Amino acid sequence: MKKILFPVMFLAVIMASSCGKDDDPTTPPPTQNVDMTKATIERTSNNSEFKEAPETLPKQITTNTVLKTGKTYLLTDFTFVLNGATIKIEPGVTIKGSKSPNKGALIITRNGKIDAQGTAAAPIVFTSNQATPNSGDWGGLILLGNAPNNGAKDGVAGLQAVEGGVNETATGYGLHGGTKADDNSGILKYVRIEYPGIAFAVNDEINGVTFGSVGSGTTVDYVQVSYSGDDSFEWFGGTVNCKHLISYRATDDDFDTDNGFSGKIQFGLVLRDAAIADFGPSGASNGFESDNDADGTTKTPQTSAIFSNMTIVGPYANATAATTAAPYKRGAHIRRNSKISIFNSVFVGWPVGLFLDGALTEASATSNALEYKNNTIAGCPLVVAPGTATFNSQTWFSTAAFANQTLAAIADVKLTNTGYTTFDPTPATGSPLLAGADFSSAKLGGGAFTTTTYVGAAAAGDTWFKGWTKFVNK
């Protein structure tokens, strides 16, 4: 097909309507004009289709900026949103992250904000700029806020530097943490993030979406991370609540919670690929992984996130144990003094369903600070990992009042389809997930959770995971 290139000269003026995270200042940051004078339009001679070359985003965004519907943008490096500025991303925008020479990433600093409101018909897409994309092609999306965490930096309690090589000593752009539980980092809605996730160093990575001390004033709803080279979602402290999260064919963990994260998460989907796992020296691919901190201390705030209505489909759903990558471990690994709670959820096809790891975590389970109730574990050779000499984890899991159930085979749970490209996690006729949810725990009160009768992320006939999502092979 013959292509004719027409250089053009034009200017895209980007307007914005929001400012920093706190009260609107008297004088809002000026609108940023993004230079489009060197853009090129490509015309294909057979259909007169015009394609605008991607616009490269600057390394620093210091004024309110709008990314316009129908356009494509490029992250060639770390791009920081600073100085109370807001980056507004309109529905249908595509943002591509570079693979080399630098990995692109978008970082919303704790003095910046994002307003990314796609729609079911026109989601916002972050993806790789490679013709043949792969896991870990680019960095990812990082949101930093001023909510509490249990870390410390340079002797300052509650201050942390985000992982992934983002923090710069001279600027502190990667710092997060404070005392504002209701801090607002903006909005993520109907957003796909494809092929992100890089290991900057051992235990120092950028995930699909990284939340650093993000507050409960932030809105996160309908977000899919696909083919992350590390975790899909990781929270370091913070209080943000999230709904309708999807982790698709991740490398490391799907939902990783650390450093005092205490948010509430409902309606989460996971589908794992038996061949894609964390093959690093200490790699362990889990559905949930949760620590209070790296050393398992008693620092506060303690990691205490609450999850409900999660469907966590592991590698055995599409493979046998013999053909599943060795790093695959547990549907949920709760360790290092974490006390997260999980309700009304289903774990399918993992080597181990649940592992409560360590005496402090077991103590939280005994005291009901950590709750695991109305959950189903299906097709896991080891349902619950053994506890210590003073804690029988299987007996605890099987407590009648907890209403947990075990199913021997993956087929017994009767999900509609667990195929990689035909994924439909709704419960089919006769599924035990159609009923059995319970929202009587005080942890599920307060209005953050939607009461359901079904267990798992989707009701029979549900479609919330369709239309704006993408379930494809690489």
Where is each model-derived feature located?
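Aromatic- and Lys/Arg-enriched surface recognition patch
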Residues: P123
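Low-complexity, highly charged intrinsically disordered N-terminal segments
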Residues: G20-D23, N33
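Primarily the HKD phosphodiesterase
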Residues: I95-K96
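Extracellular beta-rich repeat passengers
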Residues: T27-T69, L75-I87, S100-N111, G118, ...
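Positively charged n-region of N-terminal signal peptides that target proteins for export
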Residues: M1-I4, G20-K21
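C-terminal motif of bacterial Sec signal peptides marking the signal peptidase cleavage site
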Residues: M15-S18
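Sec-dependent N-terminal signal peptides
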Residues: I4-V13
